[in-house]
């Protein structure tokens, strides 16, 4: 498996528009408010010539990484791909702290939360976000001290 970094956000969006990928990931509205483009990194995760995942990170502060998107292709969950992706990411970036928000979606959150706990993350706080009048989304933020990997 290898991580292929997009040269810019523009090339990432062009890749989505061209459909030059083996899976149709949803185009997510990333939060760029606090980061310059040079502080963000977007990776395609490729195994045997096929896309198996996408990672989007922000490194706005020294020694800190924020995982904005960490997605394994549908149908590839629980096969070890996410663990490989995370280890490759940590080889490329060696932050002191890694932060992320893990959204709860009914039964799906159990799988995602289990994965991040397995990677050594710990819950640091909860907060409630109201989408529209009908939807409540719960998020959890995790941190990890890289020295304990």
Give the residues covered by each predicted segment:
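Acidic, low-complexity, intrinsically disordered interaction modules
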Residues: 36, 58-66, 124-130, 135
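Conserved acetyl-CoA-binding loop-helix of GNAT-fold acetyltransferases
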Residues: 72, 78-91
